[in-house]
Amino acid sequence: MRLIPLTTAADVGKWAARHIVEKINAFKPSAERPFILGLPTGSSPLEAYKSLVAMHQAGLVSFKHVVTFNMDEYVGLPTDHPESYHTFMHQNFFNHIDIPRENINLLNGNAEDTTAECRRYEEKIKSYGKIHLFMGGVGNDGHIAFNEPASSLASRTRIKTLTEETRIANSRFFGGDVSLVPKFALTVGVGTLLDAEEVMILVTGRNKALALQAAVEGNVNHMWTISCLQLHAKAIMVCDEPSTMELKVKTVKYFRELETESMKNL
């Protein structure tokens, strides 16, 4: 596992965006051989999306031959609802880059048969071989996507019941009213994430410190879903200073020395 200990959330976004752009450009994608990118929503990736849009506008990257798969979507929210992840992705990213609409893949939280929708999504991912890079965030309780504590580490895309803690955390997007936050979501599974060639998780804020500690210094444990990344051959945790508060000083020092070159020129 790589740990990239940066100073601010803005630094995290810039580093993540630069890494994605480097990966896409090195891959040299084409219509016949697209780059497959997994994407999250929420507050964690906002700075990364801003940086990606800026790099695209500067002519440093094209998304014309990039295919995206989003991590999750609420069940029951209309696609055009201001808090649907369809709306979030288009407002914060897709509307500002040159990605073809047909290359965008989002789960349908209003599907009549959610089991069939989840199966379709898994099959669509497999039709491309694999996701080359999956970017994600992490919840206060260590969940990735909507794989809440005690999720199977072999799980695939499915419907999940959201914990009260997650709904309370997400209520900030619904005017602080927990009753407006959906109780269910469709989400890629832990196994789906682990199938990706590379997984990059963005961790920002003091409230994520225990989750980061569990991911880096703890044991693999389904109660801390994020710890599954210890099993991945190419996992990267990109974090700001407040999120490292629960890590040992020597852990942060070790990774800072290892990643000196990669953290330059942000």
UniProtKB/Swiss-Prot annotation:
Presence of the UniProt keyword Hydrolase in the record: yes
Gene3D superfamilies: 3.40.50.1360
Coiled-coil ranges from the UniProt annotation: none
Signal peptide region: none
CDD domains per the UniProt record, alphabetical: GlcN6P_deaminase (cd01399)
A biological process from GO: N-acetylneuraminate catabolic process
Class of this enzyme: hydrolase
GO MF annotation terms: glucosamine-6-phosphate deaminase activity; identical protein binding
Top-level division of the source organism's lineage: Bacteria
Xref: Pfam families: Glucosamine_iso (PF01182)
Regulation affecting activity: Allosterically activated by N-acetylglucosamine 6-phosphate (GlcNAc6P).
SUPFAM superfamilies given in the database record: NagB/RpiA/CoA transferase-like
EC numbers for this chain: 3.5.99.6
Pathway the protein takes part in: Amino-sugar metabolism; N-acetylneuraminate degradation; D-fructose 6-phosphate from N-acetylneuraminate: step 5/5
Record's catalysed reaction(s): alpha-D-glucosamine 6-phosphate + H2O = beta-D-fructose 6-phosphate + NH4(+)
PROSITE patterns from the UniProt entry: GLC_GALNAC_ISOMERASE
Key words of the record: Allosteric enzyme, Carbohydrate metabolism, Hydrolase
Record text on subunit structure and interactions: Homohexamer.
Record family assignment: Belongs to the glucosamine/galactosamine-6-phosphate isomerase family. NagB subfamily.
Entries under PANTHER family matching the protein: GLUCOSAMINE-6-PHOSPHATE ISOMERASE
Free-text function comment from the UniProt entry: Catalyzes the reversible isomerization-deamination of glucosamine 6-phosphate (GlcN6P) to form fructose 6-phosphate (Fru6P) and ammonium ion.
Protein name (database record): Glucosamine-6-phosphate deaminase
Provenance organism: Pectobacterium carotovorum subsp. carotovorum (strain PC1)
The encoding gene: nagB
